[in-house]
Amino acid sequence: MFEFARFPRFALRQLTQVAAVASALFAMAPTQAATVNLGAYLSCRHIQLTEFPGTIVDAAIATPQLSTLVSLVIAADLTGALSGKGPLTVFAPTNDAFAKMPAALLDLIGSDPKLLTKVLTYHVTSGAADPRRNLIPTQVHTLQGQTLFLAYDADGASVNQSVASCKGVKTTNGTVWLIDSVLLPQFK
């Protein structure tokens, strides 16, 4: 008879994780399950967060790929909110993400303070959210009021249709995940 008490704890954790992933894969449609690379999922999931000694805003300022986002956060007067008490999760579009947007749309968003605030707060959730841990799409509520979908699929970790980095940055008041496109809320 197999004795779990003699089985190493780390092996039990790994076995438990594999069992959880397998059960999630079996719960999916066959074509969806076939597209998830289990090795890549487990590898991405186990990448440790980079520790940053400052706030979300400090981390963004220290990241050259986020200079466009930083300038928009300053323009929207959101530095105080993103430097305050957390935890918050920010899905941070890179400079390349903003460069992919049509210039007219970026100009429109940047010139309207209310619209800019709506777009930026759509990238922020209260609490800890990790896009690497969701084989089944999971909804999270944004500070803007609408929801985002976090998932891990054949393309890796994603937020809505945007690809998220497997390596996040943990700050004193939350976590920052780089994403490859700007998320746009539904405008009513």
Enumerate the predicted regions with their spans:
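N-terminal secretory signal peptides that target proteins for export/translocation
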Residues: 1-11
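Bacterial N-terminal signal peptides
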Residues: 16-27
